């Protein structure tokens, strides 16, 4: 599962949303707001660590435009990808493979800060592979993602994603 897919899973668990949840979290911010997330995948043979910094470039009533820079470490090797711009529509994506499995509230510590989060549990099946996850979201962090964990039949350990730094303007 890629970082983009993971973030999409985090934001697409409502049933069915009237406004794209990813847009809603960015629309609460001003241009220049950013979040740095770290994702860790254990493959059994090596750990893969991805760090992504997403910055809000523009927000309008119709869309939010963000740019993400990503660096991935495969063991001792590091690969930096070119910055990628993305337009996040205010309209929800009708192709939602998620099945909500639970929703609650929880206070967690992320980047040394206590945050009250909305917790979503979900299940999905894509390309014949079943997976499930749990995501903690908050309007305190640009983009909304505080922390997520995903498991699937083919992963030897859960994939973990967590916000490590951010600035909300």
Where are these regions (language model features)?
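Sec-dependent N-terminal signal peptides
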Residues: 1-13
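Acidic, serine/threonine-rich low-complexity disordered tracts
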Residues: 15-169
């Amino acid at each position: 599962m890629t970082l983009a897919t993971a973030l999409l899973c985090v934001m697409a668990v409502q049933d069915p949303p009237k406004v794209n949840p990813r847009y809603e979290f960015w629309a609460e911010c001003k241009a220049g707001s950013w979040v740095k997330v770290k994702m860790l995948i254990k493959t059994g043979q090596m750990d893969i660590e991805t760090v992504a910094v997403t910055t809000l470039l523009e927000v309008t009533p119709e869309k939010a435009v963000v740019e993400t820079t990503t660096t991935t470490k495969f063991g001792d090797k590091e690969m930096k990808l070119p910055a990628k711009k993305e337009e996040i529509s205010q309209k929800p994506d009708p192709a939602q493979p998620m099945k909500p499995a639970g929703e609650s509230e929880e206070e967690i510590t992320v980047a040394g800060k206590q945050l009250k989060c909305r917790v979503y549990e979900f299940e999905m099946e894509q390309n014949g592979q079943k997976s499930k996850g749990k995501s903690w979201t908050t309007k305190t962090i640009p983009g909304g993602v505080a922390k997520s964990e995903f498991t699937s039949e083919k992963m030897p350990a859960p994939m973990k994603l967590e916000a490590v730094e951010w600035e909300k303007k």
